[in-house]
UniProtKB/Swiss-Prot annotation:
Cellular component aspect of the GO annotation: cytosol
Localisation: Cytoplasm
Catalytic reactions on record: (6R)-5,10-methylene-5,6,7,8-tetrahydrofolate + glycine + H2O = (6S)-5,6,7,8-tetrahydrofolate + L-serine
Binding site for (6S)-5,6,7,8-tetrahydrofolate: 121, 125-127, 355-357
Taxonomy, superkingdom: Bacteria
Protein species of origin: Streptococcus pneumoniae (strain P1031)
Subunit structure: Homodimer.
Site (Plays an important role in substrate specificity): 229
Signal peptide per UniProt: none
The protein's name: Serine hydroxymethyltransferase
One Gene Ontology term from the biological process aspect of the record: tetrahydrofolate interconversion
Keywords annotated in UniProt: Amino-acid biosynthesis, Cytoplasm, One-carbon metabolism, Pyridoxal phosphate, Transferase
Gene Ontology molecular function: glycine hydroxymethyltransferase activity; pyridoxal phosphate binding
Length: 418
């Protein structure tokens, strides 16, 4: 028996009500977490499809089970669309997450204990770029590079000097909280100069790369990884790209049977439909609006001397704000904004002096509000509401004004049209 919504509600009211509350929360909140987005109904339909029933260890044409002709078609669609989007010769669409994709990439490029350079977490890197608490930092000898302490920009001369000193087998480029353009060609020059491989994690900027609004790493990286959500607006999952056939074989083996069993073909289907959406000309307009909205919000903060934007601005979908002149730390800011239905996250800033559980900064992203239809005017209004909240944290009347303004915005831009 396949449940419809009424069946589901009657059968498991507790779970139904929890999901309904989350739907209400998303509708009534302004979502600024840079790693979140709003998927289409088509993506949700594919992910909730009957494909969830099918086990399909292996790859199209090379499965361990029978009855896989249809899922082979589904997975091949996802692969071919990913290759078309990013101009790559090979694509693996099976990783369950970006972290799984990174793990498989490392397994394809280096050996345990090898020296690797990755971006410092506080400077904008990611846990899987060598943090001691991550499998990456525990399996490989990661050494972090940072940004210039004055400009807060990547310092390629310093990165080259460090690479010449430590002689890494692999350099990892890409970030989870860096608001400027990354020059991947320079990273490749450094890697070549020291005999290292280059891996790029473009999880945050993949949608901008797909739209031609950020330089692509694919021509320069030996392996490129990404998530399929964030700016790509797809389901939660991972993707690995390469132009090297030998590496493609290693990647496939690293994913299956290396670190995963059967792929989640319902998620692969959701990736496929989201990739079709990315190939639509309308996606480029969406991605351009994401950057416009990010810049519009950043400009409001730049005009207020009580706040400091890391690196002085943004050229992508996100930016970091040092809030310590106004509130105690980023965690306090995050909690205050939660109370007025604005959702974002505390975030470390370069050369952070506070713990990662408190932080000096907050991270603000424009992908989700742009998906709802917010424009530059609404984005500026959102930034003003953030500032108003943080500067009036003890004034309940002002906070209620902010809540009302948030409600007006979310009502004007529904999460999904009926």
């Amino acid at each position: 028996m396949i449940f419809d919504k009424d069946d589901f509600k009657a059968y498991d009211a507790d779970l139904w009500n929890a999901i309904a509350k989350e739907e209400e929360r998303q509708q009534n909140n302004i979502e600024l977490i840079a790693s979140e987005n709003v998927v289409s109904k088509a993506v949700m339909a594919a992910q909730g499809s009957i494909l969830t029933n099918k086990y399909a260890e292996g790859y199209p044409g090379r499965r361990y089970y029978g009855g896989t002709d249809v899922v082979d078609v589904v997975e091949t669609l996802a692969i071919e669309r990913a290759k078309e989007i990013f101009g790559a010769k090979f694509a693996n669409v099976q990783p369950h997450s970006g972290s799984q994709a990174n793990c498989a990439a490392y397994m394809s490029l280096i050996e345990p204990g090898d020296t690797v350079m990755g971006m410092d977490l506080a400077a904008g890197g990611h846990l899987t770029h060598g943090a001691p608490v991550s499998f990456s930092g525990q399996t490989y000898n990661f050494l972090s590079y940072s940004v210039d302490p004055e400009t807060e920009l990547l310092d390629f001369d310093a990165i080259l000097k460090q690479a010449q000193e430590v002689k890494p087998k692999l350099i990892v480029a890409g970030a989870s909280a860096y608001s400027q353009i990354i020059d991947f060609s320079k990273f490749r020059e450094i890697a070549d100069a020291v005999g290292a491989k280059l891996m790029v994690d473009m999880a945050h900027i993949a949608g901008l790369v797909a739209a031609g609004l950020h330089p692509s790493p694919v021509p320069y990286a030996h392996i490129t990884t990404t998530t399929t959500h964030k700016t790509l607006r797809g389901p939660r999952g991972g993707l690995i790209l390469t132009n090297d056939e030998d590496l493609a074989k290693k990647i496939n083996s690293a994913i299956f049977p290396g670190i995963q069993g059967g792929p989640l073909e319902h998620v692969v289907a959701a990736k496929a439909v989201s990739f079709k959406e990315v190939l639509d000309p309308a996606f480029k307009e969406y991605a351009a609006n994401v950057i416009k909205n990010s810049k519009a919000m950043a400009d409001v903060f730049l005009q207020d001397p009580d706040f400091r934007i890391i690196s002085g601005g943004t050229e992508n979908h996100l930016f970091l704000v040092d809030v310590t002149k106004v509130v105690e730390n980023g965690k306090v800011a995050q909690n205050l904004l939660d109370e007025v239905n604005i959702t974002l996250n505390k975030n470390s800033i370069p050369y952070e002096t506070l713990s990662p559980f408190k932080t000096s900064g907050i991270r603000i992203g424009a992908a989700a509000i742009t998906a709802r239809g917010f424009g530059e005017e609404e984005s500026r209004k959102v930034a003003e509401l953030i500032i108003k909240t943080l500067k009036n944290s003890e004034n309940e009347a002002v906070l209620e004004e902010v809540r009302s303004a948030v409600k007006e915005l979310t009502d004007a831009f529904p999460l999904y049209e009926e």
